Amino acid sequence: MKSEKAASFRIFLLLAAFLSEKPLRAEAPLKAPDDLLLATMEKELHRGQSELAKQDPAPYFASYNVTDGESLVILSAQGGILTSTRTRHRAADVSMRIGAPALDNTHDQERFSGITSGKLPQRDDPDAIARVLWKLSYEEYRKARQAYTNVKTKTAVRAKDEDDSPDFSEEKPSTYTDKAASVAFPEQKAWEELARRYSASFRRYPEVEESLVFLYAEKSHNYLVSTEGTKIVTADAIFRVMIEAETRADDGMQLMRVETFQFSDPAKFPSEAEVAATAKKMASDLSALHAAPLAEPYDGPALLSGRAAAVFFHEVLGHRVEGQRQRGRDEGQTFTKKVNEKILPDFLSVTDDPTLRILGGTELSGFYRFDDEGSPASRVEVVKDGILRNFLMGRLPVKNFSSSNGHGRAQSGLMPVGRQGNLIVTSSKAIPDVQLRSRFVEEIKKQGKPYGLYFEDIQGGFTLTSRDLPQAFQVLPVMVWRVYADGRPDKLVRGVDIVGTPLTVLSRIAATGDTTSVFNGICGAESGSVPVSAAAPAMLFTDMEVQKRKYGDARPPILPPPPGATENDNKEGAK
């Protein structure tokens, strides 16, 4: 995920905490899509636009985007509940554009003047809702008017932009109402008991210094109306179980494992046996990492598992093909002028398809029907047979790409920009994974290296796309193995990050496996945190560079954990 953003679990935890600021009011459980709310939004939008049309300058576009939902957040550790909060939230984003599509208040550095946000009354009181929308609309008009003045001044005194595309694309209005049946929301007490049992699994592993089990449920209705005639109502539901376990090496390095279960139906919750097996594997991994030696800087052959390759492509390629990164004086524009040129080996293709809900039996986080600007989601062929073909576009045009392809996404309260949905890498020359490993060992021998590195799992990363910074990336592996040329058993190492520049590293892919793996996560960038998925087969790189990871010097706990709970749980686990 982009720049300073941390691993996906941490990002999601912060987002969940934000949704849990205030307790649920008993007055208003979430119901079916709300016709009264939608009618109030439409009425106030058109009333406001009619009044503001008398102003100079007048808006040429306005929209209301309302999210009406409820969430349940439970955080548990060692069999106890740390947090349990059920929250109802109803919030509005008011967007407004002054000027004309060719040049408006959102131009360049004033991009985020196009939105004002606030909370709406949770009760269906049309007068109260209309009054809040009126207030937000007036605040947004004042902000947009000032920004438009700034834009005109700056445009008049500075050199012409290299890309003089319009600031807003013309799109056909969309009308849609989700008819999906409402998903039953979990009962809070039952979930708390489930969280207790899940988190108690770690009590039998004294080597785990800290563990958390995070249960999250959210269902929402999303309403979008615009002066262009768009009227969309969609329903969403998501359920997640996230498990985190941490320990600390003797030298102070923090070691972490994170596993996630995601589903759209609460009936698909993992069983206690599944969670217990996951906890056991995580504890085993942490014990092995604790004993593992520190890795050294390395440059040579590398093999990425499918899951690791998926995260790698999200960071290294995905962010750089987002539409807004192709224009603006501050953007590095790595691939802007490489359309119809080769950027990957000819056996690789990349698509982004948010219309896919399931891939290979795994539910995808990046599924949606319409983006946050009201454009229908669509499959985008980004790279075909190694050749760059397209970018991920919202309604901000770039040179030679004048229309949205349904990728304008944002967290509530922020302006949408082009973002990834479900990024999928496919190979036309896949070989069985066993053969891929053999070819990896051959490459190690060919280069005269004593070993290569196998990256089994990656927790996240960041990429730099601003022009005033190196066009580089840093990916954060968790489980990394030395694979020896002489046939010795693989050896786990720790404290290593993958680093490099995209144009170089993407040209070093030599082969892929035949099994696709999926990574689901939360991606952070300038338009906030959005759910995404990435999928890819295992990949062999002829050359990859790694560096040592920075870590602290805090000592591990001096005292062992209390013996009673651990001993009792070990006895129960042995039954």
Which role fits each region the language model picked out?
Residues 25-370, 375, 384-387, 400, ...:
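Active-site bordering "gate/hinge" segments
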Residues 366, 426-504, 520-527:
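Hydrophobic alpha-helical bundle architecture
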Residues 10-21:
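Bacterial N-terminal signal peptides
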Residues 257-260, 394-396, 494-496:
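Residue-level structural signal for beta-strand termini and adjacent loop
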Residues 1-7:
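N-terminal secretory signal peptides that target proteins for export/translocation
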Residues 376-378, 478-479:
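Short loop/turn microsegments at loop-to-beta-strand junctions
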Residues 235, 392, 492-494:
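Short linear motifs in exposed loops
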